[in-house]
């Protein structure tokens, strides 16, 4: 089960792709935390469509938890974020926290030996970028960013196909001006 597309609301726009699992069930377990932006639904859809197994979640807001359960069914919600960090099943934590908190959450995730998948923008200061860069180098963990307008946007994918097919000539530059 996954969230359906809501084209009228860019903040919760969560397209679904053709499912193309690249892992077996239970082979790649992930969790979701801090559902402050609707892109968490697109992030979750993408991970599920790739074959990932959603094993747990953390979200302080009762309403946001209910919205998530309405889309994905019953899921184990933990009462503290640290429980996700301590769970040995979890290989990656996806998050759409408030932007200025994203890097700090990612640093905690990587320090716990897990990869991190955050919504954009991933940083709000140069110091955050440097801290994450250093943590990636020392931990070996990944800090991935969900650019929905590139990864989950039919127009962007179609443009990519047109470019690949040579239908629009030689492309010198692409600029994406997102709605928010």
Show where each model-derived region lies.
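N-terminal Rossmann-like dinucleotide-binding module
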Residues: 2-72
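Short, well-ordered coil/turn segments that N-cap beta-strands
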Residues: 27, 52, 75, 91, ...
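Histidine-centered active-site/metal-ligand motif
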Residues: 37-39, 102, 115, 180
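Alpha-helical elements of Rossmann-like donor-binding domains used by nucleotide-donor carbohydrate transfer enzymes
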Residues: 42, 67, 83, 92, ...
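Residues embedded in well-ordered beta-strands within globular domains across many folds
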Residues: 58, 94, 172-175
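Beta-loop-alpha module in the N-terminal Rossmann-like domain of NAD(P)-dependent dehydrogenases
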Residues: 72-135
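A contiguous active-site-proximal alpha/beta segment in oxidoreductase catalytic domains
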Residues: 123-180
């Amino acid at each position: 089960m996954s969230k359906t597309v809501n084209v009228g609301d860019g903040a919760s726009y969560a397209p679904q792709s053709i499912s193309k699992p690249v892992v077996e069930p239970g082979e790649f377990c992930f969790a979701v935390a801090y559902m402050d932006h609707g892109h968490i639904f697109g992030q979750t859809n993408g991970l599920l469509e790739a074959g990932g197994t959603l094993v747990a979640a953390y979200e302080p807001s009762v309403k946001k938890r209910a919205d998530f359960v309405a889309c994905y069914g019953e899921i184990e919600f933990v009462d503290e974020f640290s429980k996700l960090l301590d769970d040995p099943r979890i290989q990656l934590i996806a998050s759409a926290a408030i932007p200025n908190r994203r890097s700090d959450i990612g640093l905690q995730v990587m320090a716990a030996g897990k990869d991190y998948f955050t919504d954009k923008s991933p940083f709000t200061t140069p110091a955050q970028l440097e801290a994450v860069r250093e943590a990636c180098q020392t931990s070996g963990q990944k800090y991935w960013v969900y650019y929905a307008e590139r990864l989950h946007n039919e127009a962007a994918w179609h443009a990519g196909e047109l470019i690949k097919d040579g239908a629009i000539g030689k492309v010198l530059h692409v600029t994406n001006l997102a709605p928010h």
